[in-house]
Curated annotation (Swiss-Prot):
Protein's name in the database: Glycoprotein integral membrane protein 1
Membrane topology designation: Single-pass type I membrane protein
Compartments where located: Membrane
PANTHER family found in the cross-reference section: GLYCOPROTEIN INTEGRAL MEMBRANE PROTEIN 1 (PTHR28549:SF1)
Ranges of the Cytoplasmic topological domain: 290-330
GO cellular component assignments: membrane
This protein's encoding gene: GINM1
Membrane-spanning intervals of the chain: 269-289
Signal sequence bounds: 1-23
Keywords for this protein: Glycoprotein, Membrane, Signal, Transmembrane, Transmembrane helix
Residues modified by glycosylation: N46, N64, N166, N191
Extracellular face of the membrane: 24-268
């Protein structure tokens, strides 16, 4: 898939954060306290399906998206960061007659892609903007088409919600559309309440540490083959190591995000200092040139006085030896 343009999204994120911040600065009021209750957004997603006779049927898929204690839930199913594909039972509103707008509500099994992305607003701060997008893939085993995406933006700090709002944008311009479906995290367990033990959940890309021996059998729909039952595996050192490495990766990313600005500032100071010193030295050489070349050692002229050797034995060394022999004989 081709990448969607990020210009409108970046502008919305900037306005989403700048508008409340500017209000706090101008009024001089302190930062508003977090909302007491967890935000709960029941959104309706407009989709179209193709009937057996070739007619187009318009339907609405109702999803209940909540945020509580740093965790995003979709129909009480915990969803982590990234793109997760879940299959769950939810309410579907079907328009039987478009002229009279007669609606028929029923519960069906839907397959939906959920994007959860966390945007750190400032380095070293717990202020984050959580972006949630959703795309319905199937309803009761039938392919559907979706044109618009409802984006939910939640501004949180220390797991407390400061503000949340909804936007509607075309599917082609969303981040979810630009991410390939091959990288989705599959979540095929039935709808479990978030009040139950989350440790019994098992996905195809992440495993929680809890010894659970159970299998989940899927209710086979008409015209659909059953999937292989999932069995929770006992904990192993490999899974624990994967969790440690994931935590280490997040800590390392947080560390580099705080170190990089300081490193680049230091590098900027070094480059500016070396360049400035070279310019100053060049200017000084031009203004005050050196007349003498100091590379050659210059010596003062010294008068050389010849030294004459004085011979203490003018008769030669042979006569001196004879005189010594005569004195010895005497």
């Amino acid at each position: 898939m081709e990448g969607a343009p990020l210009g409108p999204l970046a502008l919305r994120l900037l306005l989403f954060v700048a508008l409340p911040a500017s209000g706090w600065l101008t009024t001089g009021a302190p930062e508003p306290p977090p909302l007491s209750g967890a935000p709960q957004d029941g959104i309706r997603i407009n989709v179209t399906t193709l009937k057996d006779d070739g007619d187009i049927s318009k339907q609405q898929v109702v999803l209940n998206i909540t945020y509580e204690s740093g965790q995003v839930y979709v129909n009480d199913l915990p969803v982590n960061s990234g793109v997760t594909r879940i299959s769950c039972q939810t309410l579907i509103v079907k328009n039987e007659n478009l002229e009279n707008l007669e609606e028929k509500e029923y519960f069906g099994i839907v397959s939906v892609r959920i994007l959860v992305h966390e945007w750190p607003m400032t380095s070293g701060s717990s202020l984050q903007l959580i972006v949630i997008q959703e795309e319905v893939v199937e309803i009761d085993g039938k392919q559907v088409q979706q044109k618009d995406v409802t984006e939910i933006d939640i501004l949180v700090k220390n797991w407390g919600v400061l503000r949340h709002s909804n936007y509607t944008l075309p599917l082609e311009e969303s981040m979810l559309h630009s991410i390939s479906r091959d990288s989705d995290i599959l979540f095929t367990l039935p709808n479990l309440s978030k009040k139950e033990s989350v440790s019994s959940l098992q996905t195809t890309s992440q495993y929680l540490i809890r010894n659970v021996e159970t299998t989940v059998d899927e209710d086979v729909l008409p015209g659909k083959l059953p999937e292989t039952p999932l069995r929770a595996e006992p904990p192993s050192s490999y899974k624990v190591m994967c969790q440690w490495m994931e935590k280490f990766r997040k800590d390392l990313c947080r560390f580099w995000s705080s170190v990089f600005p300081v490193f680049f500032q230091f590098l900027n100071i070094m480059v500016v200092g070396i360049t400035g010193a070279a310019v100053v030295i060049t200017i000084l050489k031009v203004l005050f040139p050196v007349s003498e070349y100091k590379g050659i050692l210059q010596l003062d002229k010294v008068d050389v006085i010849p030294v004459t050797a004085i011979n203490l034995y003018p008769d030669g060394p042979e006569k001196t030896a004879e005189n010594l022999e005569d004195k010895t004989c005497i």
